[in-house]
């Protein structure tokens, strides 16, 4: 199974599920994520979330999201790392960054990602104007096998990149724990492949993690291929038929956004789970409950 198994079945870097959008490119990070205090922009909020990655009950890596929010602007840095025997064999590592503006969904203006295994690597850079792709470069270029579904120009408008896809702006001005904040479609484009991730509300749970104690929204997830995929590949059909995927969303203090607390994805090798081990914030409201009550 791959780090990209969540939304990009064609890649085979061992370690399914790296945080929704980043999973799309089979990402890992060159250095193990360590808890650190995020630096909030003046008048804004920042958060760092550290994760453990498990496959079929075995720990295989770590991941980290770092987000900064100031007014309508955001920046997202995402990384992950394969550890133990899997990491020693594959050498998987990488990092991604996105920046843009927040509206009903993230409107990215720039995205970049670089990944590497022991025997290969890939880099993607995209320039966008409020979520509309103006340029995308992949190094090395993908090999055209002649069986990929084309990505239309229309499909490259109003998209979110893999890193921005992790960021869920709250709907309206209501409670951040409103179940309606689950219900959304993420139109993801990773530079080569266009797909939708459809989220729907399942339930609300209470969690207690270092740095965060409070409600999380449990959202079911479905994958829908749009373009750039190879429809005859078994992995594509597996993911489109996969009904055993979910994400837990937690509110970010001082910002009207939610980030993943936990992601679970069934794969052909077992269930992959990415779960937060630490939630570190700066700026914004002093407590999660105060932030929720303020809105």
Language-model features, listed with the residues they occupy:
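Sec/Tat signal peptide C-region and signal peptidase I cleavage site
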Residues: 29-33
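Short, aromatic- and cysteine-enriched interfacial helices/patches
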Residues: 3-7, 25-27, 85-90
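Acidic, serine/threonine-rich low-complexity disordered tracts
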Residues: 34-130, 174-295
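Bacterial N-terminal signal peptides
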Residues: 15-26
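Bacterial N-terminal signal peptides that target proteins for export
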Residues: 3-17
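A charged, solvent-exposed segment within the mature domains of Sec-exported extracytoplasmic proteins
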Residues: 131-196
């Amino acid at each position: 199974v791959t780090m990209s198994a969540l939304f990009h079945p064609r890649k085979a870097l061992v370690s399914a599920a790296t945080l929704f959008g980043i999973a799309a490119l089979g990402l890992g990070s060159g250095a193990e994520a360590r808890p650190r205090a995020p630096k909030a922009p003046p008048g804004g909020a920042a958060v760092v979330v550290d994760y453990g990655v498990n496959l079929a009950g075995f720990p295989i890596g770590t991941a980290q999201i770092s987000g900064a929010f100031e007014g309508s602007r955001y920046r997202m840095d995402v990384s992950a790392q394969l550890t133990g025997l899997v990491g020693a064999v594959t050498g998987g590592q990488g990092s991604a960054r996105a920046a843009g503006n927040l509206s009903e969904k993230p409107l990215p203006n720039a995205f970049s990602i670089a990944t590497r295994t022991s025997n290969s690597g890939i880099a993607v850079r995209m320039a966008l104007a409020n979520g509309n792709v103006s340029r995308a470069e992949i190094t090395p270029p993908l090999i055209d096998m002649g069986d990929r579904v084309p990505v239309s120009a229309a499909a490259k408008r109003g998209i979110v990149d893999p890193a921005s896809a992790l960021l869920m702006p709250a709907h309206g001005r209501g409670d951040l724990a409103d179940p309606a904040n689950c219900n959304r479609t993420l139109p993801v484009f990773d530079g080569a492949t266009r797909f939708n991730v459809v989220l729907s509300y399942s339930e609300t749970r209470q969690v207690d993690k270092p740095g965060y104690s409070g409600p999380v929204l449990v959202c079911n997830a479905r994958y829908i291929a749009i373009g750039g995929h190879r429809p005859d590949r078994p992995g594509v059909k597996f993911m489109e038929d996969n009904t055993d995927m979910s994400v837990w969303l937690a509110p970010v203090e001082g910002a009207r956004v939610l980030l993943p607390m936990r992601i679970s994805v069934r794969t052909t090798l077992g269930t992959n789970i990415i779960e937060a081990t630490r939630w570190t914030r700066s700026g914004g409201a002093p407590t999660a409950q105060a932030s929720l009550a303020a809105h």
